[in-house]
Amino acid sequence: MSSLQQPIPPNSTLATTASSNQSGSNDFVKKLFLMLQEDSYKEVVRWTVKGDSFVVINTNEFTKDILPKHFKHSNFASFVRQLNKYDFHKVKISNEAKASYPYGEDAWEFKHPEFRINDAEALENIKRKGPTAKKSASNVTIKTEANNNGTQPTCNHNYSQLVSATNHLKEQVESLKNDKHSLYQEISVLERKYKTVVENIVAINTFNERYYRSMNVLINSIVQNGMKLPPLDFPPPVQLGPDSGIGSNLGPISSDTALPSISHHLSSPLPHHQQLLNRTIRPISSPIDGIPLVKLQQQSLGQNLQAPIGTPSAVPFSEEASSSIQAATPAPLAQPVAQPINQPPPPPPPPATQQQPLPPPPPPATATSQIPSAPPPPTQQQVGTSSSSVPTISPKSQGIVVSNSASPTTSAQISTTSVPNPKFHVLLVEDDNVCIQLCRKFLVKYGCSVTVVTDGLNAISTVEHTKYDLVLMDIVMPNLDGATATSVIRSFDTKTPIIAMTGNIEDNDLVTYLQNGMSDILAKPFTKDDLYAILSKHLLDPKENKQDNEPTVKKQKLS
């Protein structure tokens, strides 16, 4: 029989204490002391190293084996409550001390000032708490209520201040809501105005394009009919598409053949905008219609003229200038230039006469303009249909010639690079010369015919006039940004893939690009493999795209 189950000897101190103190019996504490003195449950419960407290190492084993045998408790919580009745308290272990605590993180350590190892006499000082504790608790409650009565006015004052501050915050929130609503309305008005401005800009550019076409056709007709023209100041057009055909259409432009405007495709054009778009240039069929302009020109130049005059410009043109520029014109290219769709062929040259030789027809590509770049491949031909140039008219008949120096800026230039038997026609909208050079080099290498424009307005006009297989669109450009240009293009062309080329690839920017109608994103800086991946994704058939993934092999498919 173990020592815990044996009765305590009558002459022992523990037995005497237990019999003499029935009201404040501490048998529970004595049983706990005797159990800790033994080593039978050392792995479950033991004294600490200092001996002034004990620790329950394994609460599960302690609850399962020890409590039912020695303390008649059904769970560990009731055992803890019993300890609390004898003024035992759990020792709190800080987080820093837990790292080096020798008994484990799940151990429970209890301590009483009079409960120490090998100190059985001190057990007499451990008494069970009596009902006086309840009285003291009630006294504490009474004192607390008295203190609360003293602090109630202060609490009421603080509460009133909080209510006042809350009401003030509510007023501020309502004011902010009203301001937000007003700002939203103002932004909506600004958006409508911005859309109207963009529509009018596009309409004005279309109107100017038709105007310059008509003037050019008129001057060509007069020159070919044998009439001599004086030196004229004729400005280059601000915007001409790649299929504008200046110099190739020698007949007058009537209202039936006027170019459609992009804004016809917009969802809600304004009345003033519609009137501006519907206005066409009336063809001038005889010199009589130009009499008022002739009189104005006679007053300014002091000459007797019988021909209509163009709008003034900063560059005058004379016979010598015409001869010099015509002499510097390069010979025709060996390879045919890729022409935009719906481009009428140039008419045959009229028969020459001895007295007044008629001018030969200008080539379909009105001027050659190249962005400075490295020497192109042998198959690369760069033919610019620059919107900042007017074609050379008649080298021997005092025609009108416009030099590229009349408009030195490159923001309005349009150039086309063709390859033999191109499989795809790509429009590159970019204003950076280095990016133009690299993209054009790779696109030509992959067998694509490339048209380059350098601003958003030219991009809109070019896409309206010519069908492209893919558009590479820069975002930050002069005149009109790429996102706005894409939104305008999507009003009349929803199928052509438009790829955004930008270094701004934040989530908000990407969402904006996609909302404006862009099909995909090509993040700058990119490699030729990235460019090829975009081309294969949007131009190749899915079967062809799956067969090869190497750019060197894919290049043969594109070509």
Swiss-Prot record:
Domain comment (free text): Homotrimerization occurs through formation of a three-stranded coiled-coil structure generated by intermolecular interactions between HR-A/B regions allowing DNA-binding activity.
Organism, scientific name: Candida albicans (strain SC5314 / ATCC MYA-2876)
Gene name tied to this protein: SKN7
Entry-linked PANTHER family: HYBRID SIGNAL TRANSDUCTION HISTIDINE KINASE J (PTHR45339:SF1)
Domain spans labelled Response regulatory: 425-539
Keywords noted in UniProt: Coiled coil, DNA-binding, Nucleus, Phosphoprotein, Stress response, Transcription, Transcription regulation, Two-component regulatory system
Gene Ontology molecular-function annotations: DNA-binding transcription factor activity; phosphorelay response regulator activity; sequence-specific DNA binding
Modified residues annotated as 4-aspartylphosphate in this record: D474
Pfam families: HSF_DNA-bind (PF00447), Response_reg (PF00072)
Composition-biased stretches (Low complexity): 380-397
Name of the protein this chain belongs to: Transcription factor SKN7
Biological role stated in the UniProt entry: Transcription factor that is part of a SLN1-YPD1-SKN7 two-component regulatory system, which controls gene expression in response to changes in the osmolarity of the extracellular environment. Under low osmotic conditions, phosphorylated and activated by the phosphorelay intermediate protein YPD1. Also activated in response to oxidative stress, independent on the two-component regulatory system. Regulates heat shock genes in response to oxidative stress and genes involved in cell wall integrity in response to osmotic changes.
Region (Disordered): 1-23, 312-405
Places the protein is found: Nucleus
Region (Hydrophobic repeat HR-A/B): 151-222
Recorded phenotype for the gene knockout or disruption: Leads to sensitivity to H(2)O(2) in vitro, but only mildly attenuated virulence.
Annotated segments matching region DNA-binding domain: 25-131
Modifications the protein undergoes after translation, according to the UniProt entry: Phosphorylated by the phosphorelay intermediate protein YPD1.
Family, per entry: Belongs to the SKN7 family.
GO cellular component entries: cytosol; nucleus
